[in-house]
Amino acid sequence: MVVSREEVREIIGRGNAIVIYEDHLLNLNGWLERHPGGEKAIHHMIGRDASDEMNAYHDPETVKTFKRWSIGRVKLPWDNLVPPIQGGNYSFDKVDQRVIYKKLGIFPGVKIEPKVQENIVLTEKSASKLLPVGGVRDPKTIIEDFDNKLVYEDIKQIPSLDHETQRNLSLQYNELHQTIINRGYYQCDYWQYFKEFCRISSLFLLFVLFLRSKWYTLSAISIGLMWQQLVFIAHDAGHISITHNYQIDNIIGIIIANFIGGLSLGWWKRNHNVHHLVTNDPVHDPDIQHLPFFAVSSRLLGNVFSTYYEKYLWFDKIAQKMLQIQHKLYYPILSFGRFNLYRLSWSHLIMGLGPRKGKAAWFRYLELIGLCFFSYWFFYKTMSYIPTKTLRFWFLLISHWTTMIVHVQIVLSHFAMSTSDLGSTESFVSRQLRTTMDVDCPEWFDFFHGGLQFQAIHHLFPRLPRHNFRKVQPLVIEFCKNTGLHYSIYGFVDGNGKVVNKMADVASQVVILNDCLHSIHLENTTGKNLYEAKVESVSIKG
């Protein structure tokens, strides 16, 4: 049975989680609670052709099971609907609000507005009409004004967003993916993990040796570096890219993340899966939602409702003060990042936000045991070995400050990149390359970055073992040359410079917005509103 686009809209409107895979209409109502990747990952794909995403994130055996959820066929090519969680327009008059929230991710009393409405294809010409810039006096429009300029710049730098061009990009991406599979790049090089084991074991031995020798600063640095390196293996395990066995890789990840590192692998996976699907979207991607401390998009300056955290991110007085100097506070705040991860990890497990049913459900209890074990061996046993409260305090700070390195590495790949919503026509491959950068470094130094230097490649092929990223890089570069997509790569210093500059740009918008709010009624000697005059003097940095 072939189902039309409007019929699909009606089926979703009856409270069904409908996703398009190839030419099949999948009803995932019965899978939401069991999906190991979390229900929100599915919510963001409702009404869309998710073929590229589903093939990229799942192993071949899992891919074979997709069509068992099929309830019909659709005619290809499919024009994406906007998912309900992203503000799609559906009629839910006869559906219970609890069903809508559970199955579709819609929040009662909250209205999400997509930047680009359904059936709109952004072009340079249409963007100037749909996303006007300039001549504003209302302080609320400063957010849209700044963001619209960035959207316009993005449109000029990528291939056309029309359906045919984006479908061709998808086809070429799938050809590239098949080439990578055929060349055996999904085979994990376990010799590289033996090297990782030796390196991390050495850091652990140094931690113990220095601790017993009462060289507490060196001991703290050693364990901090060990945690930094362990994060990369936990990341690999979370993507099932070590053994490609779901249970084994998750157990490896939990031992490393929870038992040794004190962080929840389940929390990270739930967060990270959404991040991969809606990368750098200010409303939906939790990886760039850090108010009141950071904002990398002016869209976060307007009390945005986070569909991930299910709450408003308030642009309150604290945020208004902090964001004006965020580029100056960037590194100091990142140095305390691990403490926030402890909070998020415990909250995730205590509140039971991970899968409650299916093969991933039991991980919650193993993770809780892991966090308790970590608290015992680090916060109790290790700290009790240090004689004074002052030394314990500094040991705690130095060990956690050392892990700031990995926080810088994580955000480097995305903070400086596009945060624009270009509409539902943009393909998976276009979005990933537009919102992600790689970091240039010599091959011998790859271990230090742990694969995070190839985040653009990782976002295209999430299950690919990281030790093969460098082998795949020439293929991705050639692909980008052939398609007109841009492969962004910068040195570590230059990349950090772009991040800080991006944050300074947004900080300048906060200053302007605050000036507007305080002086909207005052006029300067030219008769212009002070806010309007200042807007004219500010230009967006490239």
UniProtKB/Swiss-Prot annotation:
Its Enzyme Commission number? 1.14.19.18
Motif range for Histidine box-1? 235-239
The kind of enzyme this is, by top-level EC class, is oxidoreductase
Cross-referenced Pfam families: Cyt-b5, FA_desaturase
Per UniProt, what is the membrane topology?
A: Multi-pass membrane protein
Instruction: List GO molecular-function terms, semicolon-separated.
Output: metal ion binding; oxidoreductase activity, acting on paired donors, with oxidation of a pair of donors resulting in the reduction of molecular oxygen to two molecules of water
Top-rank lineage group of the source organism? Eukaryota
Q: Where is this motif: Histidine box-2?
A: 272-276
Binding positions for heme per the UniProt entry:
H35, H58
Please name the GO terms of the biological process aspect recorded for this protein, alphabetically. Answer: sphingolipid metabolic process
Q: Where are the transmembrane segments?
A: 215-235, 248-268, 329-346, 360-380, 393-413
**According to its UniProt record, in which pathway does this protein act?**
Lipid metabolism; sphingolipid metabolism
Q: Which pairs are disulfide-linked?
A: none
Localization: Membrane
What keywords is this UniProt entry annotated with? Electron transport, Heme, Iron, Lipid metabolism, Membrane, Metal-binding, Oxidoreductase, Sphingolipid metabolism, Transmembrane, Transmembrane helix, Transport
SMART domains cross-referenced by the UniProt entry: Cyt-b5 (SM01117)
Under the heading InterPro entries, the entry gives: Cyt_B5-like_heme/steroid-bd, Cyt_B5-like_heme/steroid_sf, FA_desaturase_dom, Fatty_acid_desaturase
Cellular-component GO terms for this entry: membrane
Motif Histidine box-3 mapped to chain: 455-459
Q: Which SUPFAM superfamilies match?
A: Cytochrome b5-like heme/steroid binding domain
Give the Cytochrome b5 heme-binding domain ranges.
Answer: 1-75
Q: What's the catalysed reaction? A: an N-acylsphing-4-enine + 2 Fe(II)-[cytochrome b5] + O2 + 2 H(+) = a (4E,8E)-4-sphinga-4,8-dienine ceramide + 2 Fe(III)-[cytochrome b5] + 2 H2O
- Name the protein family: Belongs to the fatty acid desaturase type 1 family.
Function, as annotated, reads:
Delta(8)-fatty-acid desaturase which introduces a double bond at the 8-position in the long-chain base (LCB) of ceramides. Required for the formation of the di-unsaturated sphingoid base (E,E)-sphinga-4,8-dienine during glucosylceramide (GluCer) biosynthesis.
Q: What is this protein called?
A: Delta 8-(E)-sphingolipid desaturase
Organism ancestry: Eukaryota, Fungi, Dikarya, Ascomycota, Saccharomycotina
